[in-house]
C-alpha cells in the first residue's frame, strides 16, 4: 500500500502533538514501514493547483494538505481511503473509499 508524503507528515506529527511515549512512537514507525511513501513531482504540483482552483471556484475550498493527498492519489490512480470523506467530496475524478 502507498501513502502520500503529506499523510506521512501528518502521521509523524501525531506523537509530538499527543505526547506519545516511546513505545507508541516505535509502533507507529514500524507500522509506517509497511507503506511506500509517494512524493510530489511537477505533475503532482500541476494536479494540486487544479484541485485547489476547481474546489475554490465550486465554493468548496480545500485545505492545502488535503489537496496534496488528493493530488497524489489522482496522479497515481489510487483510491483515497479516508475517515474524512467530506474533506475530499468536492474533488473531481477521485475514487474515495470511506472508512468508519
Please report, for each region that a protein language model flagged, where it lies by residue.
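Flexible glycine-rich beta->alpha loop in the catalytic core of nucleotide-sugar glycosyltransferases
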Residues: 86
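Conserved acidic donor-binding loop of glycosyltransferase catalytic domains
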Residues: 83
Amino acid at each position: 500500500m502507498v501513502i502520500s508524503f503529506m499523510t506521512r507528515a501528518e502521521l509523524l506529527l501525531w506523537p509530538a502533538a499527543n505526547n506519545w511515549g516511546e513505545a507508541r512512537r516505535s509502533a507507529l514507525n514500524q507500522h509506517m514501514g509497511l507503506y511506500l511513501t509517494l512524493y510530489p513531482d511537477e505533475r503532482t504540483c500541476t494536479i494540486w493547483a487544479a484541485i485547489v482552483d476547481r474546489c475554490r471556484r465550486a465554493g468548496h475550498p480545500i485545505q492545502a494538505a488535503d489537496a496534496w493527498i488528493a493530488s497524489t492519489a489522482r496522479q497515481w490512480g489510487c483510491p483515497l481511503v479516508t475517515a474524512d470523506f467530506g474533506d475530499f467530496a468536492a474533488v473531481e475524478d477521485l475514487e474515495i473509499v470511506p472508512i468508519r
